Amino acid sequence: MTIVLNHTIVPARDKRAAARSFAEIFGLHLEDEASTHFAPVRVNDALTLLFDEDAEFESHHYAFHVSEAEFDAIFRRVKAAGIPYGSAPWSLDDGKLNDWNGGRGVYFKNADGHILELMTVPQ
């Protein structure tokens, strides 16, 4: 049996703004919110991020394996939005990419302080 993550909750101060920003940066679409309490963003056929409001929360780290073309498109939007980025979770604003595992990687924070990671890994 293959185990696949179906959804996870992403805490946010403003769930709709956070979901909209994530969708714009990642080139995705907001799902219909009418039937749910959450602000959902479908990442792929298996995974949906459910943004939910919370007054207090710790920051989380969300890592996404993407194709080279997806990396280029998302990274362009990160830079166009003026979001600081870096090569590691401990250097989020060094303006560099990493080449770990033979691919490219980058880290950046969203408005709620969550660390988002993009990585390409040759298959």
Segments the model singles out, each with a brief description of its role:
Residues 35-38, 58, 93, 100-102:
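Short acidic/glycine-enriched loop/turn segments that link adjacent beta-strands
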Residues 2-3, 9-48, 53-55:
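Core segments of cupin and vicinal oxygen chelate
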Residues 27-28, 38, 43-44, 78-81, ...:
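Generic alpha-helical hydrophobic packing signal
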Residues 22, 75, 120:
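Short, flexible helix/strand-to-coil boundary loops that buttress conserved ligand/catalytic motifs
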Residues 5-13, 55-81, 83-123:
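Vicinal oxygen chelate
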Residues 47-49, 60, 116:
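Short beta-strand segments
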